[in-house]
Amino acid sequence: LKLVTGINFRHTDGWRNTDMQWDQNQLKPGSTMLTVNRSSNYTLSENLEWQVNRKLNLTAEGTYYERWVMRTHGPWKYLPNDFYYRNYTFAAGSRYKLNRRNYLTADLSYGRYGYFYDYKLKDITDYFKDGDRITYYPGQRIKQSIQQQVLAQVKGIFYFGDRHILNTGIEYQYNRLESPHHIAGDIASVYTLAAYAQEEWTATSNLILTAGVRGTQHKETGLNLSPKVSALYKAGNFNLRASYAMGFKAPTIKELYYEHTGSIGGSSLTAYHGNTDLKAQTSQYTSISVEYAGSKFQASLTGYANFIRNMIELVEIKVTPEEKLLEIEKSKKYTNLTKARIYGMDFTFNYRPTKYIMLGGGYSY
């Protein structure tokens, strides 16, 4: 039995680069806003590991986190609130050895992430309840969002002789977001269910082939299949690799449903809009690489191409008359772009001329 307790605390008084601030399409002097706000946070953690017997190993962990962000009030912005964050997570896992090298794992985790406003000044909002405008007062802590996530995984690794390794598993992920005034109906949720299988075949002492497929069912985007194949050929000190994979990225719960307004670093006040019509982002990725591993010198050269469809990006849209009344200067919405192509090359090397000296470098294009 092994227990590990962790305590971490951080604090900054904040700092700023300039007293200039962008406000109402003008750069104005005399601002009291900081580039980095004054803040404090701490994390408590507990980890448990129990080797029940030769076959079964159990783990558990939990964390608790709080953070306070203090904002300065003054020209040119009325900042009635500070920020407060409170998170906690729990996780449990197990690993069970079957015969020989085969084993099963099962993991379950839960996380809750809270974001609040701590009011220090009176704030007459643009929200209404029962026909009355909502007003907040100093000392109130008002929930902005509570995000909860559940992740469950079961995986099995199976060896068939000395040449075949089968990796299979299923995953379930559930996300729930509660955010008054920022989501229609105040609450939204999505789920993802996935299953996968991958076979690694050592065809010869020099050649290893891998093939797999992953199927994903998402609440909003439906079913998607993502195959993958790769090959590794060993020739003396050289390794030659080639791979092809189809990728899948479902839109996040905030990209789908969340609506909010904010300003980053004194920039323009911007409205951000989720989009329930988003499609899943898909990609086709291929790469070829050559590696050399000598006693003193190692190097790797990789070329790759990635063809992306329905890429999810924030796109600027026209500011509505209602947003202009709220002094919003920009408006952006999560949108699927038609296509994107990415080509690149990576080169890295390491050289050890003596026992005590090692040189290394790299270049990416």
Give the role of each language-model region.
Residues W15-W22, G62-Y65, M70-Y78, F116-T125, ...:
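Outer-membrane beta-barrel translocator domains and adjoining extracellular loop/strand segments
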Residues K2-D19, K55-G74, L108-R112, F116-D123, ...:
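Surface-exposed extracellular loop regions of Gram-negative outer-membrane beta-barrel proteins
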Residues N53, G161-I165, E171, N175-R309, ...:
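Structural signature of Gram-negative outer-membrane beta-barrels, strongest in the C-terminal barrel
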Residues D162, T202-N206, G303-F307, L326-Y365:
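Gram-negative outer-membrane beta-barrel transporters
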Residues P29-L34, H73-N81, T89, G93, ...:
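Extracellular loop and loop/strand-boundary signature of outer-membrane beta-barrel proteins
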Residues T12-N25, P29-S45, E49-T105, Y110-Q148:
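Flexible loop and strand-edge segments within Gram-negative outer membrane beta-barrel domains
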Residues Y103-Y119, K234-A235, R241, D277-T335, ...:
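Membrane-embedded beta-barrel scaffold of Gram-negative outer-membrane proteins
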Residues L1, Y42-E46, R86-A92, L108, ...:
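Hydrophobic, lipid-facing positions within transmembrane beta-strands of outer-membrane proteins
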